[in-house]
Each structure stands twice: as structure tokens, then as C-alpha cells.
Amino acid sequence: MANVFVNINDLSNQELLSMIHQALLFKSGQFIPVINRQVVANLFFENSTRTATSFQMAEMKLGYQRIVIDPNKSSATKGESLEDTLKTLKAIGIDTIVIRHSLRDWYQPFYEMAGKEVPKLVNAGDGNGQHPSQSLLDLMTIVEHFENFVGLRVRIIGDIYHSRVARSNAEILNRLGVEVTFSGPKEWQDQSLEQFGSFVGIDKDLGKQDVIMLLRVQHERLTDEENQDFTIDKYHEDYGLTQDRYRKLKSNAIIMHPAPVNRDVEIDSDLVESDKSRIFQQMKNGVYARMAILNSLTIPSLISGVGK
């Protein structure tokens, strides 16, 4: 793990809990190491507000020297392969690179090269594959509220098939002892996730859930036919967190969403800032979770020692 952070499920439970603990220390202001002379590059082939900005904020807080590369102005537009881009950046002196790419598993060919022939690698999202930094900040947010994972019930609702968040979170939550269930349109279910939890109707046992994790409808990944058939009102009625559904939730349940939020689609607009919502807390936690990720690549001994 010392040279890559590409899949949250590559971490042992001890590494994961230590990283969450360090993120909480960063948030409390108790522990801010200064990273001298390290250079990190950010290369996002897909649009991003929260992930891109919070990685840059994390880099600033840690003292990294930062470079932002616009792929539309890079040699990728001339046909340069991702491998050659990475080798070029390593040769120039980039220590770590944060990449978001539409290609699922873009990082697979580079595991052995990371930190040697190419920079150390951070996956900021790969197609509908993994979103490990989002998973870490989500776990951090759950720990802040519940202090533990074992025995919790998490309902993931929405566009499951196209969501890297659903895939990342379902596997790691299941491993940590959480009971995971999924709800959403039948055509957006992903049978490969049934090993981590069952698909149920949205209203089944909704009042027994500890965490409601809503997912954005990813129109950019839908077919033209799917987008034409989609109606906001119908989706909100069938799968959205409406006021009626909100009133059924447990008193200590929390609402989460990786954002961007489509108000009055996945969730009633008034509920985005409700008492149960942790949506903006997730965004805040994203900075500290990503600080822990970057720090684990620069000073891995700190991660192995924190929380023991």
C-alpha cells in the first residue's frame, strides 16, 4: 500500500481504522505534519468539484507543492497513452499523482511501477469501479456519529449500477460487519453486488436503517433511451427520500450523499440541510480523509502506528 491508494478494499482492517483515526486527528487539529519538497499532480479526466477541490485543499494543508494538469491541454489529446503520461511526469519529478479517469481499473497495469517508473498513485475515481477516497470519508462520517460499524444497517438507494461509490462502500461496509441493503430501479441494479447485500424495496424496513446513503442519478452514464424515459417526479416518488419517508426514519439515523445532489430528485430539497443530514459534513471530512491518504503515501509509518 505504500505506493498506491487505489481501492479501499486493499487495506487491512487495522490500516483502515488507523487511517480513519488519523483523519479525525487532522480534523481536530492535533496532528498536521509538514511535507517538504514533495510534488503532487492532479489529473482529472472527468469533471469534479468536491473531490478535486478537497484533494487540492488537503495538499495545501500538508504543505505539498501542487500542479494541476488539464487533460484537454495535455498530450493525451495527441494520443499519448496514460502509461507514457505517467512515466513522463515521474521523469519530470512528480512524486505523487491523483487521477480520476472514466476507464474502470485504469490503475491495474501500474501497481508494480508506482513509486519507481511512475509516480505514487491515488485513485480519485475510475469509471463505475472504485471511489476509495469517498469511501474513507464516508466511513469517517459514520464513525463520528456511531463510533463503530458492527451491527449497523446501511441502505444504499439510487443508481446502483453506474455508481463507483456503491461498489466501494458496499464491499468495505460488509467486511466491517455492516448489514447492507440496496434499493433502486430494477434496471440499475448490479447483480455482482449481491454478495455484499440484498436488493429490497425502498420502503422495506426503512425505519430500521441507521444510515440512508443516497446516490445521484448519473445521466452522463445513461443511454439516450434511458435519459428519455427518465422523469424527475416519477423517480422522486418511487426512490427519493421524501418527507413521508423521512418521518419513518429512526431518531438517530443519518442521511448521506456523495454529491452533487439533485434536489427534489434523490432527496427532498428541504432535507438536504435537515438535522439527520450529514451531506455537508461529508464534504468537510473529505479534506481530512484525503490528507490521511496522501500522508499514508509520504510517511507510511505514521499510518501503521496511529491508533494502535
Curated annotation (Swiss-Prot):
Its pathway?
Pyrimidine metabolism; UMP biosynthesis via de novo pathway; (S)-dihydroorotate from bicarbonate: step 2/3
A molecular function annotated in GO for this UniProt entry is: aspartate carbamoyltransferase activity
GO cellular component term, pick one: cytosol
- Keywords in alphabetical order, please: Pyrimidine biosynthesis, Transferase
Which reaction equations make up its catalytic activity? carbamoyl phosphate + L-aspartate = N-carbamoyl-L-aspartate + phosphate + H(+)
- State if Transferase is listed as a keyword: yes
One Gene Ontology term from the biological process aspect of the record? 'de novo' UMP biosynthetic process
Entry annotated with the keyword Repeat? no
Could you say which enzyme class this protein belongs to?
transferase
Q: What is its EC number?
A: 2.1.3.2
Please list the disulfide bridges: none
- Where along this sequence does the record place binding of L-aspartate? K78, R164, R216
Q: Which residues bind carbamoyl phosphate?
A: R50, T51, R100, H131, Q134, A259, P260
Q: Which family does it belong to?
A: Belongs to the aspartate/ornithine carbamoyltransferase superfamily. ATCase family.
Q: What function is annotated for this protein? A: Catalyzes the condensation of carbamoyl phosphate and aspartate to form carbamoyl aspartate and inorganic phosphate, the committed step in the de novo pyrimidine nucleotide biosynthesis pathway.
Quaternary state and interactors: Heterododecamer (2C3:3R2) of six catalytic PyrB chains organized as two trimers (C3), and six regulatory PyrI chains organized as three dimers (R2).
**Name the UniProt record assigns to this protein:** Aspartate carbamoyltransferase catalytic subunit
